[in-house]
């Protein structure tokens, strides 16, 4: 008999809008699709930068089993203590001595703070990993880097879910038992620029000067999650769910399957 496991992965949760979208939508989808385990990237969940203890407990209380991160993982000072007490994961290739358990959440190189090589660190992590169903959150800027990572580990892990850009991509696929999507996309403000109020980013592009980004609070929200179905370590099915305020039905996209 098939040993099926269903895992939900929620893309970058950004600010209050993202948390409320998750709290409103995740419990019903957990029941509907009988999810066994849920992972979410929450490095932007508190004001768009980092994760506080209060917000971590809030998200874990609505059904999330593990929280991943990226370049904003350490933006809030209380997160170090949280990593010792709660299922909050730092990028595995963060420098040695950094807090956190380092289960497979990796950070890319291009356009991000310097870390150890994600490709080499992933090889090292897999050698010591005894889990049957392996899901990697690859938090990276460049789709080319994510694609190269997928090609290296295709057939060796169950799923690779890209995060960081906040913009969902249309390339969900399954090849050699490995599901892949370049970016799941944010859960947060649908209006604005990658979850932030539009004014500051637009000014930055117009003037070339830095402006303080603020989370867009008065907005339509979007919730985005990919569901992976694993059978003995291989992904056999995957689909993405999008829920947007004002759109009556959830939008569902199934993975393209290749032999």
How would you name each of these model-derived features?
Residues 1-259:
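Acidic, metal/ion-coordinating pockets
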């Amino acid at each position: 008999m098939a040993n099926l496991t269903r895992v939900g992965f929620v893309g970058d949760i950004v600010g209050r809008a993202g948390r409320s979208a998750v709290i409103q939508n995740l419990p019903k989808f957990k029941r509907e699709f009988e999810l066994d385990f849920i992972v979410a990237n929450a490095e932007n969940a508190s004001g768009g930068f980092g994760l506080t203890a209060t917000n971590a407990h809030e998200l874990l209380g609505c059904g999330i089993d593990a929280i991943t991160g990226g370049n904003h993982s350490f933006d809030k000072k209380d997160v170090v203590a949280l990593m010792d007490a709660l299922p909050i994961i730092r990028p595995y290739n963060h420098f040695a001595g950094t807090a956190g358990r380092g289960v497979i959440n990796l950070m890319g190189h291009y356009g991000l703070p310097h870390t150890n090589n994600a490709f080499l660190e992933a090889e090292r992590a897999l050698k010591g990993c005894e889990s049957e169903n392996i899901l990697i959150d690859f938090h990276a800027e460049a789709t080319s880097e994510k694609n190269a990572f997928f090609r290296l580990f295709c057939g060796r892990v169950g799923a690779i879910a890209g995060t960081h850009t906040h913009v969902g991509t249309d390339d969900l696929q399954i090849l050699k038992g490995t599901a892949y999507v370049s970016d799941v996309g944010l859960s947060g403000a649908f209006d604005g620029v990658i979850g932030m109020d539009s004014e500051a980013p637009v000014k930055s592009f117009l003037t070339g000067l830095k402006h303080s980004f603020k989370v867009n609070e008065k907005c339509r929200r979007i919730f985005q999650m990919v569901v992976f179905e694993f059978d003995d370590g291989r992904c056999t099915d995957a689909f993405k769910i999008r829920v947007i305020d004002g759109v009556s039905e959830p939008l569902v996209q199934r993975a393209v399957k290749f032999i």
